[in-house]
Amino acid sequence: MHLKSLLLAALPLLLEASPTIKGEDTASLAINTSSGIFAPYFDRQQPNVASFLDIPYAETPIGNLRFAPPVEKKNAGDDIVHTTKLPAGCIQYLPALLRGTINDGPITAGTFQRGDYANTTEDCLKISLFAPEKSVRAKEGKKTQALPVIVWIHGGGYSVGGTNVPYQLAQNWVQRTQKHIVVQVQYRLNLLGFPNAEGLAREGNNLNLGLLDQRLAVEWVRNNIARFGGDPDRITLWGESAGGYAVDGYLFTWAQDPIIKGVIADSGNALALEGVVGDSRNHTGFSLAAKSMGCGGLLPKDELECMRHVPERNLKEYLQAEVGQGGAADDGLTVSVIADNITVFSNYTERISGNSAKYPANIPVLIGTNTNEGAAVVPYKFPGFETATELPDQLKPLADGFGLNLQCTTLKETRLRAEAGATTYQYLYAGNFTNISPLPWLGAYHTAELPLVFGTYETEGPSTKFERRMSERMQDLYLEFASDPSHGLEKSGWPRAESQPERSKLVKLAADNKVEQVFSAKKLVDECVQNGFAV
């Protein structure tokens, strides 16, 4: 898929590192980790942030490791690695149903929400780590308090995305607060991360490899973050969209050994997965791809082995092909997590209880949605789209359905968690800023809150005073939660969710020129019930 010219012009500025501005050899600040020795780079725009841009946490998943669980990366020796640009992303695939939406890049804001198609590889199981300079220097005898850690899991429908998304880079946030560390994780996507292959299923092998990648990355953080000045006992897992599903679902998968102490789920939750998990018995998608790769007509075991030897270039061409070029989009390839009742479950609603073997209700969750989620999933180029203030009637059912599903499953989960005695805080984001939502009808679309939290909201143009205030407050709120998941937001006046939805309260962000305001969930609950959603 081609990228817009503006993206091509901007990406080198964002992805390539400026020359180091520290008056020393950064090798003196190198950190010895379980997967190698890494020296930081310092950018002119964020001079007090030590950026470790390209750290592998797993072996390259090629050959026999393609379509297999990730293998921990081992320290290769004494060489110091000093990288000056972000890692190449995992191979991308934009499904047919998202072609023609803002996710397809017709406007720059939409383009900046997904990864760089031109720079992808299977050698992508990397993290990018951003820490205050002072925390990295602690090993020189300048003691600092261990910092809370936020591990970011990107969205993108398990098909696109990565670290190299300008809206989703954490340096500005860390530069401003100097009080936390952010680790951004890449994981395998689409056919390579979620291969519903019969050859795997027959042997009882896991089909949700991308989720196993995420877990291995969390283990890497636990084992290494203290060396960067981070607190391994204060790790919060944060994700949005598919990343929101992943981090919320993580609690169910790793209930007996979660490692993390808090979860932030933006516009995604485990209960919403119940309606979109794939059928573990339907292997036609993988076999169709295999046929296109010259591996058709084989027994399942042989099909899998053949696909493990397909050149990476061929896979990239197939997955990233434009419509009409005989690629995955033309084959109608769909990507979904598979309910195996090990990493993904089909009964999340039933599993939320006080039974810690099934669900760790002791881990607090901050969860929320946006007021116009569905604007991101409808065809954008309708008549008059450049000046319209709302969607045309024929597109509203699709947009409303997408948004209501997120809103109502979120309300349902907050109720179930409250019944289980779990600490839960809920937000509703309503921000509408022209440098993020340049078309009048977009509003607070799916992902629109992220530039505020990351502090990248000026990527597309200057901000307003209110937008800057909003960004700083959201950054502080997320950090308050990560610093003390049980009580941090409560100290800021946030109410905990209650077991009776009509009595529960949540916090509305960026609505009516107000930074935050507490309001009743009853109106949202009523809207769900009127549209047939159980909360």
UniProtKB/Swiss-Prot annotation:
Temperature remarks: Optimum temperature is 35 to 38 degrees Celsius.
Positions in coiled-coil regions: none
Known glycosylation sites: N32, N119, N282, N341, N347, N432
Location within or outside the cell: Secreted
Enzymatic reactions: a carboxylic ester + H2O = an alcohol + a carboxylate + H(+)
Residues forming the catalytic site: S241
Family statement drawn from the similarity comment of this UniProt entry: Belongs to the type-B carboxylesterase/lipase family.
Name under which the protein is recorded: Secreted lipase 5
Gene: LIP5
